[in-house]
């Protein structure tokens, strides 16, 4: 990337690296995570001001065509203050200070589709968790509107384009695609795949992956700060 000429650069690269003998290729050992067969839950008690709820659902990476529908699904749920989660939990129900979802298809291995919510003081953790489940069920029962779908596609497309607003960022994106095994051509195919996603695709992946048996739930329970340990007074600071 940058102001370089291939006809002058390639001979230099060959001169420097071609004499180096090729070593044996390392044997790839990839562990496959077993299928999750039921919900997992954990509570974490730490010093904090408000509770925090997180849901994680196992989903595929770039190697599955479903990854593009999941990318659009994330945008519908949590991109901006007009998103479904923000409108429902923050504006309407007022039980969360912040809420959203996260997913990245550019991963070496299958990944997670996250939901998170920062619980409003005075609201119950169970209420917020149930509200997240209702939004998931809503998507499973009703596909997004054409307006929602097109807005999400526009957001994902704009983010992808602006991510490559410099040669450095473009090179980093191509390098990431190569390093995880996706191949650099997948970067050029991304927008075409995103534009092909339909509302029925969104509903289908929500039904397939956002299920109770496929989720892990983590909840942060706030604890009061520990009392400060008393400091020695000046009279006791010296040696006896």
Each language-model region and where it sits:
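Charge-rich, well-structured scaffold segments of protease-associated domains
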Residues: 1-25, 43, 53, 92-240
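His/Glu-based metal-binding/catalytic segments typifying zinc-dependent metallopeptidases
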Residues: 25-84, 176
């Amino acid at each position: 990337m940058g102001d370089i000429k291939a006809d002058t650069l390639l001979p230099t690269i060959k001169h420097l690296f071609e004499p180096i003998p090729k070593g044996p290729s390392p044997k790839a050992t990839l562990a496959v995570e077993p299928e999750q067969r039921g919900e997992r839950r954990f509570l974490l008690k730490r010093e904090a001001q408000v509770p925090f709820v997180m849901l994680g659902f196992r989903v595929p990476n770039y190697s599955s065509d479903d990854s593009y529908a999941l990318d659009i699904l994330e945008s519908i749920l949590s991109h901006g203050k007009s998103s479904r989660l923000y409108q429902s939990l923050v504006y309407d129900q007022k039980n969360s200070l912040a809420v959203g979802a996260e997913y990245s298809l550019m991963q070496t291995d299958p990944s997670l589709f996250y939901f998170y919510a920062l619980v409003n003081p005075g609201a119950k953790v169970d209420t917020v968790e149930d509200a997240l489940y209702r939004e998931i069920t809503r998507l499973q029962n009703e596909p997004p509107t054409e307006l929602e779908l097109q807005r999400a596609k526009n957001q994902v497309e704009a983010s992808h384009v602006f991510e490559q607003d410099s040669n450095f960022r473009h090179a980093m994106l191509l390098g990431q695609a190569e390093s995880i095994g996706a191949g650099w051509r997948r970067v050029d195919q991304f927008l075409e795949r995103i534009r092909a996603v339909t509302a029925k695709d969104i509903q289908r992946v929500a039904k397939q992956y956002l299920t109770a048996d496929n989720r892990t739930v983590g909840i942060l329970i706030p604890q009061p700060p520990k009392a400060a340990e008393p400091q020695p007074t000046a009279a006791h600071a010296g040696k006896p």
